[in-house]
Amino acid sequence: MPSRPDKNLETFPNPTQERDYHIHMEIPEFTCLCPKTGQPDFATLILDYIPDKKCVELKSLKLYIWSFRDENAFHEAVTNRIVDDLATALQPRYLRLTAKFYVRGGIFTTVVAEHRHSGWTPLPSVDLFHFDSQPSTRG
């Protein structure tokens, strides 16, 4: 496998397709270039997805992310492009990318973009921190 930037996203079969489960990744080394100034823009990407048939292979994701370091891109455009590329490669049930860009001109920018597979409905959320372990039906 190459160890230089690469736009190819590799996948592998989801080992548990019968269950909705959440994959969370934090990618603190994203870099692209500001199309106005040519200066580097840095961001932490937070990727959350619920796979369907495929999962993303981590090294290919790293090389894909590196491939943006010499590209001119507005924050909004690059965030949505990454979502589109991941959605095309993975065809997930749900995917959300949060791009938290470092300060530029005194402004922090966060861009959030989502993809939802048509027809997919999330299961009800379970919040164990607020789970009532002593419901009123018990004495």
UniProtKB/Swiss-Prot annotation:
One Gene Ontology term of the molecular function aspect: preQ1 synthase activity
Residues annotated as transmembrane: none
Name of a matching Pfam family: QueF
Localization per Swiss-Prot or TrEMBL: Cytoplasm
InterPro entries: GTP-CH-I_C/QueF (IPR043133), NADPH_dep_7-cyano-7-deazaG_red (IPR050084), QueF (IPR029500), QueF_type1 (IPR016856)
Active-site positions on this chain: 34, 41
Residues that hold substrate according to the record: 56-58, 75-76
Pathway(s) of this molecule: tRNA modification; tRNA-queuosine biosynthesis
Superkingdom, taxonomy of origin: Bacteria
Reactions accelerated catalytically: 7-aminomethyl-7-carbaguanine + 2 NADP(+) = 7-cyano-7-deazaguanine + 2 NADPH + 3 H(+)
Main location as per UniProt: cytoplasm
One GO CC annotation: cytoplasm
Intrachain disulfide bonds: none
Key words of the record: Cytoplasm, NADP, Oxidoreductase, Queuosine biosynthesis
Enzyme Commission number: 1.7.1.13
Role description: Catalyzes the NADPH-dependent reduction of 7-cyano-7-deazaguanine (preQ0) to 7-aminomethyl-7-deazaguanine (preQ1).
Family recorded in the similarity comment: Belongs to the GTP cyclohydrolase I family. QueF type 1 subfamily.
The protein's name in its UniProt record: NADPH-dependent 7-cyano-7-deazaguanine reductase
Native source organism of the sequence: Nitrosospira multiformis (strain ATCC 25196 / NCIMB 11849 / C 71)
Gene behind the chain: queF
